[in-house]
Amino acid sequence: MVLDGNSIINRAYYGVRPLTTRDGFFTHAIFGFLTMLGRLLDEEKPEALCVAFDRREPTFRHLEYEGYKATRHAMPEELAMQIPVLKDVLDAMNIPRYELAGFEADDLIGTISRKCESAGWDCVVATGDKDSLQLVTEHTTVKLISTRMGQTTTKDMTPESFREVYGFAPIHIVDLKALMGDASDNIPGVPGVGEKTAMALIQKYQSIDEIYRLLPDIEAKPNVIKKLTEGEESARQSFHLATIVTDAPLEFSPQDNLRKAPSDALYPLFMKLEFTKLIDKYGLKPPADIPAAEEPVDLTVTAEAVTTVEKAKEYLSLFRKAEHVTLLALPDLSGVIVDFVAGESTAVSAEFYFSRYEGDWNALLRALFSDDIKKVSHNVKDLQRTLLENDLPIEGFIFDTALAGYLLDATAGKYDIASLFAACFHQTLAEPKHLDPDAFSMLGDTAEAETAFHVYTSAVDALYEAFAPELEKRELHELYYEVELPLCAVLARMEHAGMRVDANALAAFGSEMEVQLKTLEQHIYEESGGPFNINSPKQLGEVLFERLQLPHGKKTKTGWSTNADVLEKLRWENPIVEEVLQYRQYAKFRSTYCDGLLKVIAPDGRIHTSFQMTVTATGRLSSTEPNLQNIPTRTQLGSEFRRMFVPADGCVLVDADYSQIELRLLAHIADDEAMKQAFLTGEDIHTVTAAQVFGVPTDQVTKQMRSHAKAVNFGIVYGISAFSLAQDIGVPVYEAKEYIETYFERFPGIRRYMDEVVAQAKERGYVETLMHRRRALPELAASNFNTRSFGERVARNMPIQGTAADVIKLAMVRVDERLHKENLKAKLILQVHDELIVECPEEEKEMVARLLTEEMEGAVHLSVPLTAEAHWGINWLEAK
């Protein structure tokens, strides 16, 4: 198999979202190329493999025709810089590559394919360039690679499949280009002859030689014959330019390209590029005989198993004296490894296992997790929840390496110990089959597992030593130590507390949904003329657009599109559409919320969600297993559903949320006087915006005007386009565009902020919140317009949304501290974006409501007031 190197890396560059290393080097084209290479190897399993590349020098085609490829744009710098590195990677993978001055990669591929055939080998050409189709024979298959909407597909072109598409033999693709030309290569063809005419001529006459032999007696319109006659010289030259050379002076033998194992040089290259997933995929290990670029981190320690109470007391005394200890625990708390420095610099590791300890295991754990031992760990929140579930203290944690890694790079995606260690130190950690490095689950009492457990604990300590000063350097220490780290304990307590659900009411609600679904189902069958599977998009599309002949149908490869956007446009065309939309809504509620939540109610009658701290790039918390943050609020069904969430007996729920926090932050960050004034005077911001945009006094603002202004306000924060705004509020695009332009005229500070934050992000390579949370934006350096536009939208939005996330987190820490300080029985149990829910005894409700508003409003001090409102009730709906 021979790969068209330039074609594939070019497609990877434009088809893969920009990726960079921590020092800013772009890697997405290389990563995309290697991903495609892996797929091709899995599909074809070739015995021999090589890659062909273009060279920078002019080829014989440039010398013969000055205009050859003259219209092509220069290669983007961020792509050009990756090609030499890709070649280094291929060399390290022991994959031969070919280049030849004066010839293109296509010519080398053509020559290689013919040499393979002569040697009795079949050849597969992998490329995204259709020029190579002329090489298709019984023994050479062209595997065409195409990328659409981020999805890569391949199609094998054989003589048979080619003829099915084109209607002539593969070799005559050159004749086709001789007539119609090739805009991408600036090959002229015959002026005035397009693809349709050229295709018809070649299908009938096969070649330009035959066409010109029969001129002027061919079957064609007189003007076509005239163009062919006048353009013969151009056709002949175009034929020559489009013909791939198959006898280039290239030394090649299939036997010299047999596949080999990667060399030791591949591991450090992948480490440098931060391709940790590919290191795992290829099973690479650090080369023993090649010195690392940096001094490797020594993870060896002097270890001792602690089995007696006396020895445990001795170690606990040492732990209390140490500046810090680094600790990892198994999920069931049956084993704990503690690393610490004894004396001057000696690293010591103490291992505690329940099965080997002769004393009171619970008392030992209580001592280990008390406040007088300062602990560094990984995924502290999860460990704290486990401790709470075992009625153990959760104090003394001074650092969480997972959280630190996330703050230092919020777009890395993986924050397990092995990934962070690889990215930080360019070393991989062994992952024995007996150890799950993400959860640290022992799958057997083995020496191998114990050794790995020690290694991972030492790795966490090394990460702590690397991350702590880096947080200080990037001005992230306050956010980390005052918000993120203390939030771990807050969330652990919230998860442990859970939220009570009225299971009987929820089951009854589900039964009611089932009745509604049956009723809707019968109505839909009556309207459509018979039963069908309403949940099948294919069958639904056939009913709506074929049987009922509704307008505006859009066909896809799998049938008619019946997504929400399509159905919304048809809502008034036929009653069946409204009923289908209702059916989908009820079905979603029943399966996701009724049936789904009933399954996860714990024996204590409560749902214990898990809050994820390292998932979103903006810093927002997310909720899983189950997700309690996505329960709909804008529909009657969603509102009714909140009735199912109730407090413990004798308690109420107190719900407090911020009022328009993102708009208030926008006013502060953008320093727009008009918007700030509206908040300072307590005016309704949407009414003020409507008055500004529509040019009317505030007392003349209609309900619709305010609604449109609200959409504009929140749309601006998220970088909405005129097209999207038009769809949201149901106006023409030009009208939506006028709204946005008028908005920026009336609030010039917002426009200035939007421009300045993008310019600053392009200069720095990142944006940040008021509390210095960063998000890297390699997308801003992309040459692809859509990718770059995405980066600009994120640059405008992230400082606002990210600061809102920081503020609510800080508010949670303050609320939790205050509840404990005032010895209240109230418990913070849920956070949903800008909303906090507390469960408290009836007699504490007023105090808790006041406490919530005070701590939320006092979390940060802005140039505009930050306001929060609190309400209480006997269920979540009433409290809201």
Over which residues does each language-model region extend?
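Conserved RNase H-like, two-metal-ion catalytic cores of nucleic-acid enzymes
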Residues: 1, 11-50, 66-67, 71-78, ...
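Extended two-metal-dependent nuclease catalytic cores across DNA- and RNA-processing enzymes
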Residues: 19-21, 70-250
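Active-site-proximal helix-loop-helix substrate-binding element of RNase H-like nuclease domains
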Residues: 99, 149-155, 159-177, 295-301, ...
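Conserved "right-hand" nucleotidyltransferase catalytic core of DNA-directed polymerases
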Residues: 231-356, 378, 420, 442-633, ...
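Function-dense linear segments that define catalytic or interfacial modules
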Residues: 337-342, 375, 408, 415-431, ...
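Active-site palm subdomain of RNA-directed nucleic acid polymerases
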Residues: 471-483, 487, 807, 811-832, ...
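Conserved catalytic core of nucleic-acid polymerases
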Residues: 496, 594, 604, 608-609, ...
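C-terminal polymerase-core module
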Residues: 515-522, 526-578, 745-793, 797-799, ...
